[in-house]
Amino acid sequence: HLMRWQSKWSVGFPGWHLECSAMSTKYLGKTFDIHGGGQDLKFPHHENEIAQNHGACGCQPAHYWMHGNMLLLNGRKMSKSEGNSILPMELIAGSNPIIPESFSPMAIRFFMLQSHYRSTLDLTHDALKAAEKGLSRLRDAYGLLAKLQVNPGREDLKVNQTIQSEIDGMYEDMSNDFNTSKTIARLFELASIINIYYNNPQTDAGLNEESIELLQKAFDHFLGSILGIRLKDDVVGDSENFTDGLMEVILELRAKARENKDWPTSDLIRDKLSRLDIQVKDGKDGVTWSIVK
């Protein structure tokens, strides 16, 4: 230790816990809002931080403490010495043989948010695939919002109340110890409502403009701003415009084939796109496509 001093008990030097108190006080002040860390740090590390801050500043260092639980890998504790570990960039690149398939940063983030931060989380290939599929479902529903038909004067009041109830519930869930898993479950309920009304536009009752606006804000606010999920597939800028334009040309060719009753060509285009993780859906109001990975 470079910092040493003589005391009446023995040679003194800074303890292992003091650096955290020193850094937080310097950069965040005597008291800040949220202190994070793993559950294994509750004792002795965080208890020592509290004791140090009371001694030096006369107050608690943080208003709230968030202790995350362990992240398992295929049901086992991560251990570099046992070869059971994986790095974030290895997940994104698919360069680790434990989980050899690559996953987007948003899919990995969504996977983690589906569990409460104080729950044990098991990182597996199947769980990541399920999260990937779930994220695609929410993104697809968000994309359909702009295509929903408004039936003025014939709105389903019960559904409108359900939408508002789910939104109110999301505020309650996030206020209750950041319960992201319940919030995401409610977003799936809203996605189901969007799909029902998109696939059945001729129903006697429908959504009014206010409800569609509420749905839009719910996805933007909770999934986008709070949970930090990009609401479109993981392509940006010119790449996105290029993909949209290319798909428009391909689907026009497929539409021509169907118009000429050339079913083999139509099916071939759909199947080839499916192998590239692009899903084509034929609906009452036309054809839609989405990236399922």
Region spans (language model):
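Structural preference for alpha-helix termini/caps and helix-kink/transition segments
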Residues: I86-K293
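Alpha-helical recognition segments enriched in aromatics with Gly/Pro capping
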Residues: H1-A146
